[in-house]
């Protein structure tokens, strides 16, 4: 009787543990684009842990995506014994000293945030990733170009970078390339016709504005790609990079720039897509986006007040 009771008790413990594990993640579904089927979250993480560079392409305003990003970090940490680096689009190169000082305990969190220009949603969406990396003693890379320089490029073109003083030039990738390729076609498609927006302009002026905005996008990608490749080069670290999905979808943008600098690196690309209904989520039409598509349950929109 005691044996039967012990077996039953063990069975219940296993069941409850499995339920607790499943409930630890927000509602989601993971689509493996190579296998062409939905898979378990842990199966995805196990594969990502074998890569050299992992890109987590997000929609910046989706809270469930950010929770799952932290879960990816936790899952990789359980499986990878070698060096791991967290890199973020959300911090810019010129605040790397403040990031390092906070990780080392030389700055309080309040001092760190005052000095590092975090995004407004940092406390709710990115803090958990940084704090996890800090607890694991992982380096955190502020990999993006300072916004003020990207704005100058958007106004004046790449010539704006040439005029930067030597010390400031180091905050931007050394090699800059902005080809009219598939990434340009995607970007132009998203931007659309700018002639009908804001200040009236001629078609030529609108085309110039779109091109210079694209140049600013390329400078961001080049700078983040250089930061990622440099971090990987140190001791062969696995680099996990969080960025807006446009920067990594279809392995373009930042992925392409990092690959150019680290041609032998194994790269895993994840794209998080919020949807209204997980049951009808279909990964097949979007299977070229990356290695995995993680569908999250989009937050319900609040009804407008009458």
What are these regions (language model features)?
Residues 26-29, 49-59, 108-114:
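Acidic/histidine-rich, surface-exposed loop or edge segments in extracytoplasmic proteins
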Residues 223-234, 246-306:
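C-terminal regions of proteins
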Residues 62-71, 75-85, 93-102:
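Membrane-embedded segments
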Residues 18-51:
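N- or domain-start disorder-to-order transition segments that initiate the globular core
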Residues 97-231:
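A substrate-binding/cap region within the structured catalytic cores of diverse enzymes
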Residues 84-91, 268-272:
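Short internal beta-strands
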Residues 59-63, 91-95, 146-150, 245-248, ...:
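Solvent-exposed loop/turn segments at secondary-structure junctions
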Residues 7-19:
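Bacterial N-terminal signal peptides
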